[in-house]
Amino acid sequence: MQPLGIIAIAALVVAIILAIVVWTIVFIEYRRIKKQRRIDCLLDRITERAEDSGNESEGDREKLSKLVEMGHHAPWDIDDL
């Protein structure tokens, strides 16, 4: 094989590896953004229901805690007393 052919094959392999790495990073970021949108939507819904009725929806709070994976720890104050 000629040196130019070897270089072309090596460049093709490197390009394929780079494409796999880039698309993997894009997919991971897409999942992170999608999860953040669901969290933001639930936060908005909980806030809206709290303003309307004076209390949060327990189901929404459970969904949020599953998404955040922190149990009932949330970035806002929760008065369960």
From Swiss-Prot:
What are the TM regions of this chain, as residue ranges?
Answer: 8-28
Domain of life according to the entry: Viruses
Sites bearing Phosphoserine, chain numbering: S53, S57
Where is this chain primarily localised?
host cell
What is a biological process (GO) this protein takes part in? symbiont-mediated suppression of host innate immune response
- From the Swiss-Prot or TrEMBL record, what is one GO molecular function term? monoatomic cation channel activity
For the keyword Transmembrane, the answer is yes
Topology with respect to the bilayer: Single-pass type I membrane protein
Any one GO CC term of this protein is: host cell membrane
Question: So what family is this one in?
Answer: Belongs to the HIV-1 VPU protein family.
Q: Give the note.
A: HIV-1 lineages are divided in three main groups, M (for Major), O (for Outlier), and N (for New, or Non-M, Non-O). The vast majority of strains found worldwide belong to the group M. Group O seems to be endemic to and largely confined to Cameroon and neighboring countries in West Central Africa, where these viruses represent a small minority of HIV-1 strains. The group N is represented by a limited number of isolates from Cameroonian persons. The group M is further subdivided in 9 clades or subtypes (A to D, F to H, J and K).
Complex and partners:
Homopentamer. Interacts with host CD4 and BRTC; these interactions induce proteasomal degradation of CD4. Interacts with host BST2; this interaction leads to the degradation of host BST2. Interacts with host FBXW11. Interacts with host AP1M1; this interaction plays a role in the mistrafficking and subsequent degradation of host BST2. Interacts with host RANBP2; this interaction allows Vpu to down-regulate host BLM sumoylation.
Record's comment describing the protein's domains: The N-terminus and transmembrane domains are required for self-oligomerization and proper virion budding, whereas the cytoplasmic domain is required for CD4 degradation. The cytoplasmic domain is composed of 2 amphipathic alpha helix that form a U-shape.
What the protein does?
A: Enhances virion budding by targeting host CD4 and Tetherin/BST2 to proteasome degradation. Degradation of CD4 prevents any unwanted premature interactions between viral Env and its host receptor CD4 in the endoplasmic reticulum. Degradation of antiretroviral protein Tetherin/BST2 is important for virion budding, as BST2 tethers new viral particles to the host cell membrane. Mechanistically, Vpu bridges either CD4 or BST2 to BTRC, a substrate recognition subunit of the Skp1/Cullin/F-box protein E3 ubiquitin ligase, induces their ubiquitination and subsequent proteasomal degradation.
Record-given protein name = Protein Vpu
Organismal lineage: Viruses, Riboviria, Pararnavirae, Artverviricota, Revtraviricetes
> Gene encoding it?
vpu
